């Protein structure tokens, strides 16, 4: 289980901590932020990209496959639901769409290439985003 604490004192800079590491998020100048850190969508995409790279590395280590490097690039955008060719259910309005480009470097045979392509979608963050999330929210005031 992962745990993150976020604190905003003023402006748009949010200080984040998991108890061992600290980092921050912000909005770009055009959204009235100070651009001192990645925005929330960039943090989401960085989680997905890191998970993809780590999942591939751990799989290769487990199978004894030599992996030279992985570069994962993700973009998020909103598209009209009617333009979504991958969507199972018809939806109205806009949907969020994540596009990826994953470059896996190494000397792989055809079977390994096929399997590594499948492993990309097996990263836990990808699975979470694909199947949806149940939220339990508790808001308090003082």
Describe these PLM feature segments.
Residues 48-52:
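Alpha-helical metal-binding/catalytic segments enriched in His/Glu/Asp
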């Amino acid at each position: 289980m992962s745990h993150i604490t976020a604190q905003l004192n003023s402006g748009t800079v949010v200080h984040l901590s998991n108890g061992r590491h600290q980092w921050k998020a912000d909005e770009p100048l055009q959204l009235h932020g100070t651009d001192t850190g990645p925005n929330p969508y960039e943090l989401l995409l960085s989680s997905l990209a890191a998970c993809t790279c780590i999942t591939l590395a751990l799989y290769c280590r487990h199978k004894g496959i030599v992996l030279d490097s992985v570069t994962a690039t993700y973009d998020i955008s909103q598209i009209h639901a009617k333009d979504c060719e991958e969507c199972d259910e018809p939806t109205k309005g806009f949907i969020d769409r994540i596009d990826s480009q994953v470059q896996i470097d190494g000397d792989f045979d055809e079977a390994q290439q096929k399997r590594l392509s499948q492993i990309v979608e097996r990263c836990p963050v990808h699975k979470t985003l694909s199947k949806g999330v149940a939220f339990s929210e508790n808001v308090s005031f003082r």
